[in-house]
Structure formats: C-alpha cells, structure tokens
A protein has these predicted regions:
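Short glycine/proline- and acidic residue-enriched helix-loop micro-motifs
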Residues: 64-70
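DEDD superfamily 3′-5′ metal-dependent exonuclease/proofreading module
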Residues: 1-27, 34-39, 71-241
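Short, surface-exposed acidic-centric catalytic microdomains
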Residues: 42-62
Length: 241
C-alpha cells in the first residue's frame, strides 16, 4: 500500500521584502504540485511589484531588484487573490500542502490578503480542510536532539534532497516537497499510520512545544524574546487603540 506521503502533494513558498510578517511584502511566490514520487512537477509562479522599495539585504538573498519587479511584476491585489484561490483549489482536492516554516509564508500571505483584498486566508479557504505539512516542524520533533541549524538548505543536505537555486520560490517549494517525502520515509514507522489531518493537528502541538522551548532558551541566555506558538498561521494582531 502506498503511503500518503508518496502520493499527491503540493508545496508553497514565497520570497519577500523581509522577515516581518506584519509589515513586509511578497515579491514572488510559487506553488508546485506532484501526483506521486518521481512524477512530473507542475509549477505555478507569481512575480509581484510590492509597491514599496525592496531592501538591499533582501535583494542579496533572492536577487529580485526594484527595477526588475517594477518592469515585470504585477500589482499585489490580483496576485494575492490568485494565490489564495490556487491554494484553496489544491487543498480542496485533499492534497496536503507542504510549507517550510508555515507560520511565516502563510501569515505573510494572510496579511497581504487583508491589506489588498480586505479578506483573509481563512476566508478563501472557507470549508476547505487545510492540511499543512511543515518539514521544519517535523524534523525538529522527530530528531529533536540533533544539534545544528534547520534551514531548508541544511535539511536538504541532511536528507540528501537536491536544492538547485536556493531562494527562488519555485526551487524552494520543490525542494520542500521532496524533503517531506524524505523525512516521512526516514521516520515511516512513526508517521505512516497518521493521516494528513492527524499529522496537521500534531504539528500544531509540536510547534507550540518547540516555541516554549526556544523561549526558555532565550531566557536562559539572558536575552528574553517571545516566540509565537501559533501554527500554521499566526492570529491577526489586535488593532491599535
């Protein structure tokens, strides 16, 4: 019997103006879909003119300049609508959605939808079940005592997954998809009996525990810092009085 992680998966990734999910903007995004291990990968790409300058530090990471985005990018409102509809369509088929560090990409998309569409990611999903698989959360739970960084590049190296063109949204999404397959194979005895819906719920619990552990480490190091326990989407911040 083929396990779900060898079957249909989709994966989503973004490149952005920075790391603040409340203020930064999406400049490119990609969704990849694959029906089975080794099957053809279908890629949908979006390029966005964010309407604000892209910091030099962000351009150094993903290579997208203000000039390139102004010439080739589309305005955010229709792009965010397309992205959200595409994610909803994929999830409606029952495909698990792979998102590396999901609270970043999905929260940023949610804030862009609120900014440009007066809507939310939950509004687009409506009754569509969201079954996210986050390779970062999986690896951190399943191999919790391993030292070292857990970036996409590091995890791909560890699990022997090719990553060509890191910090390109399509390349990162494709690598994240293969990374989930590789992690689930390695830890198959612990995961194969879980449905995607059950794994989604467990990851929310695991991520919250990981956030508490990181907060404790920060406090012990003398640099207290809050870590949001929400997964896969951070709640909207309350409006300022």
């Amino acid at each position: 019997m083929m396990h779900w992680f060898e079957g249909p998966l989709a994966a989503f990734d973004t490149e952005t103006t920075g790391v603040d999910v409340e203020q930064d903007r999406i400049v490119s995004a990609a969704l990849v879909a694959q029906d089975t291990t080794g099957g053809r990968v279908r890629v949908t790409r979006w390029l966005v003119n964010p309407g604000i300058p892209v910091p030099a530090g962000a351009t150094e990471i993903h290579g997208l300049t203000d000039d390139h985005l102004q010439r080739n990018g589309r305005w955010p409102a229709p792009v965010m609508d397309e992205i959200a509809r595409t994610l909803a369509e994929q999830c409606a088929t029952g495909r698990p959605l792979v998102v590396m560090n999901a609270p970043f990409d999905l929260t940023l998309l949610d804030r862009e939808l609120r900014r440009h569409r007066a809507s939310s990611l939950a509004g687009y999903m409506a009754d569509v079940p969201l079954r996210v698989v986050d390779p970062r959360v999986l690896d951190k739970h399943l191999d919790r005592y391993r030292k070292g960084r857990r970036t996409l590049t590091d995890l791909c190296r560890l699990y022997e997954v090719p990553l060509d063109g890191a910090h390109d949204a399509a390349a990162d999404a494709s690598a994240s998809l293969e990374l989930v397959r590789a992690i689930c194979r390695r830890f198959s005895p612990r995961l194969e009996r879980l449905s995607p819906a059950e794994l989604h719920a467990l990851q929310a619990t695991w991520h919250a525990a990981q956030a508490r552990g990181l907060e404790a480490w920060f406090a012990k190091s003398g640099t207290p810092e809050p870590v949001d326990p929400a997964w896969p989407l951070r709640p909207e911040l309350p409006a300022a009085a």
